[in-house]
Amino acid sequence: MYRLLIICVLILASCKQEKPEIELTLAQKIANAHGFENWDKVKEFHFTFNVNKDSSHFGRSWVWKPKANEVTMLTEKDTITYNTSKIEQESINTDRAFINDKYWALLPFQLIWDTSATLGEPFKVEAPISKIELNKVTLTYPSDGGYTPGDAYDIFYYDYFIIKEWVYRKANANEPSMTNTFENYEKFSGIKIAQDHKKAEGNWNLNFTNIKVITE
């Protein structure tokens, strides 16, 4: 009886020590699959945003210091630095460009950061470009606030939560405004970034170069 009592006490003690597993949200699963758990160590994020269409090229470079709330844009004509925690009137256009370019680079993390947006329920569907069966979930923004209110994004991802394609629908229109791939993934200090975003047809590629992630 005494031995049985000891065993029961040990079992109860073991149960108390075991912490229940917390079920991650879909947004967390997608973000973590792309390295979000490493973001808190990031001091600087450098990247160049490019759009290549046929023989034309557009590009601008960024240095983002998230812990210092500082962003610098570098183009052939200008170098502009501003504080993201207090955006002055003269910095709005630069900030608008940064938000756009960062969104393409770090879409999985925006699922966590953009708390005002709504992430719907996922379901299986044929992806628009690859024509393979993927999970689809829609991210919808509120109709007021932000630079592009009311927009929606249909995100197509694998069962292991890596994003493969997306459809952008301006103002949550029924028809796609733009459809692109997420490809040529590479890790930078644990952050997984799709370096190329192509269309189904045409010589068009939105891509990232000069990526550098500096951590603490």
Predicted segment positions?
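Flexible, processing/modification-adjacent segments and terminal tails
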Residues: E18-E23, S85-D151, A173
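N-terminal mature ectodomain segment of secretory-pathway/periplasmic proteins
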Residues: K19, E23-I92, L119, P128
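Ser/Thr- (and often Asn-) enriched beta-sheet segments in non-cytosolic proteins
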Residues: H46-T48, S61-V63, T72, T79-T81, ...
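Gly/Pro-enriched, hydrophobic low-complexity segments
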Residues: I132-E216
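Intrinsically disordered terminal and processing segments
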Residues: I22-L24, A33-E37, A117-E126, G202-E216
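Sec-dependent signal peptide recognition
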Residues: M1-I7
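C-terminal motif of bacterial Sec signal peptides marking the signal peptidase cleavage site
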Residues: I11-S14
